[in-house]
UniProtKB/Swiss-Prot annotation:
Stored PROSITE patterns: PUR_PYR_PR_TRANSFER
This protein's name: Orotate phosphoribosyltransferase
PANTHER family according to UniProt: OROTATE PHOSPHORIBOSYLTRANSFERASE 1-RELATED (PTHR46683:SF1)
Gene: pyrE
A GO biological process held by the record: 'de novo' UMP biosynthetic process
EC number annotated for this UniProt entry: 2.4.2.10
Amino acid sequence: MEKYQSDFIQLAIKHQALCFGEFVLKSGRTSPYFFNAGRFQTGSALAELGRHYAAAITAAGVDFDVVFGPAYKGIPLAAATAIALADEFGRDLPYCYNRKEAKDHGEGGTLVGAPLKGRILIVDDVITAGTAVREVMGIIQQAGAQPAAVLIGLNRQEKGRGELSAIQEVEQNFGVPVISIINLNHIIHYLEHQPGQAALVDRIKSYRATYGVEL
């Protein structure tokens, strides 16, 4: 596990973006952990979060021209990632986001920021059903651009309704990589090295054995 990944886990726990307990998901499953990027609610937390996103995409070595944030959670994540790429990695790239509703006055349209041109990096918090990604792919295609990759905070490595995860389905359907700062295995590895967490690790491993995808 890279330092930026363990630092991200610590940041997420500190801000209660990563919580442990019993959480009923939309799927009806009871999960021993839950991730919510909306808990990064301060300027310093968002700045650090952007640095971790930027580190993950840099480590992946993906070539892209524009950073795109899907409304709504993806908007601050894309902005923070673009800032970190410029400040920390010397890559001053344009960014863009969409509105949920088209604007019929002023600049109009559904897109705000830089034009969608070339290879597009999509930045979001998680992929659950993949619905948001499908919508974004349509926006990118309509603009005449190409998706380069999807960058998210956490890969739960969890089956959807079938044997594949939503992330694996996105990769298969659209032919683009989905890159995450961390995945479930990173969380388990981190907790295994923390005192007094053996019972929690066992619960997470049991959940993974039931719902985890084959990697």
